[in-house]
A protein has these predicted regions:
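Short hydrophobic core segments
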Residues: 12, 167-176, 308
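Beta1/beta-strand and adjacent pyrophosphate-binding region of the FAD-binding site
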Residues: 5-15
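Active-site substrate-recognition segment that forms the wall
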Residues: 16, 20-28, 34-37, 45-46, ...
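Conserved FAD-binding subdomain of flavin-dependent enzymes
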Residues: 24-86
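C-terminal catalytic lobe of FAD-dependent flavoproteins
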Residues: 137, 141, 263-322
Length: 322
């Protein structure tokens, strides 16, 4: 029997976008298989801080809709301890006071931080509650949900997504930067250096200052560790992390929360974000039954359920293969 017997959708890629898309398609009644060269733990998503936040995003109604959809979905998942998702207080600092963040109505518990509690280098700060995921746990949770819904995982590298249209009705490309080999020259890499530290009561909650596009500063408290970041270095592909860079990240994070100085660094990791001028969540121009969902940059988790929902809608508009 063919591995694709009874399947009508193939999702390529097993990062957060691929897994979420596969789950959403399965929940919509599709029979789905994931084809991926790597399992979830080997993907770029596995290295993410996995905090809901619109990093470096100009006001955009489509982005807002997708982020709002994801916020709601992950908020609901936070009630299931096995999901690895929890709601955490986030304080974001701003160098310029432009009023309430444009995306703020997505988040619950929003309030302006009293000026006396804002470091002098910042103009203002806002506090809100946001979803945060323990990446390994959450990705495994999504995979298990997918399999329980009748999905299949096939370890297979794909060279040409369109060739799979002979096997199933719909193919969804969620390959991230791997989509560049399929002809998307608009994709580029952004190198991200992140540190993991042991949990400590000196740091409670999450903190962000993303005013520097090349050096976003963030502290993300998770269930079993604290993530410190970071960098956004265009087109750098080296996996070497210098001590000076590690010290710089710790120093920047300490300016947001003094308790960081008490943390013990466990390890330093490098990931590569798939960056594009905007995420590509569309039907392919040449093949009507080939859909794309990639290029989210640092917003993979923030947009995951919203983009997956859009793919389900697009799939419903695809003409029959017959």
């Amino acid at each position: 029997m063919s591995v694709m017997s009874g399947m009508d959708v193939i999702v390529i890629g097993a990062g957060v976008s691929g897994l979420t898309t596969a789950v959403a398609m399965s929940l919509a009644g599709r029979r789905v298989a994931i084809f991926a060269a790597e399992g979830p733990s080997q993907t770029t998503s596995a290295l993410a801080a996995a905090i809901w936040h619109p990093f470096y995003q100009a006001p955009d109604l489509i982005y807002l809709s997708r982020a709002r959809h994801t916020y709601g979905a992950m908020h609901r998942l936070s009630s299931d301890a096995s999901s690895g998702v929890s709601m955490r207080p986030l304080t974001e600092y701003f160098r310029r006071d432009a009023g309430v963040p444009w995306w703020a109505d997505c988040a619950s518990g929003l309030c302006r931080v009293p000026p006396a509690r804002v470091p002098s280098r910042f103009a203002c700060a806002y506090r809100m509650d946001v979803p945060v995921a323990v990446t390994e746990t959450y990705l495994r949770y999504l995979m298990n949900m997918f399999l329980e819904l009748g999905g299949r995982f096939v370890p297979r590298r794909i060279e040409d997504p369109s060739a799979l249209l002979d096997e199933v009705e719909i193919v969804v490309n969620c390959c991230g930067f791997g989509s560049r080999q399929f002809g998307d020259d608009a994709l580029s890499l952004s190198r991200a250096v992140v540190l993991r530290a042991t949990r400590d009561d000196a740091v409670q909650g999450c903190f962000i200052d993303d005013s520097d596009p090349f050096a976003p500063t963030y502290i993300v408290e998770r269930d079993d560790d604290i993530v410190l970041g970071g960098t956004a270095e265009p087109d750098l592909t080296s996996t070497v992390i210098g001590q000076r860079q590690i010290d710089g990240i710790v120093r920047r994070c300490t300016r947001l929360c003094e308790g960081v100085a008490a943390l013990r660094i466990i390890d330093a990791r490098v990931g590569f974000r798939p960056v594009r001028h905007s995420p590509r969540v569309v039907r392919d121009e040449r093949y009507a039954r080939l859909l794309h969902n990639y290029g989210h940059g640092g917003g993979g988790f923030t947009l995951s359920w919203g983009c997956a929902n859009d793919i389900v809608r697009l799939a419903g508009e695809v003409p029959s293969a017959a």
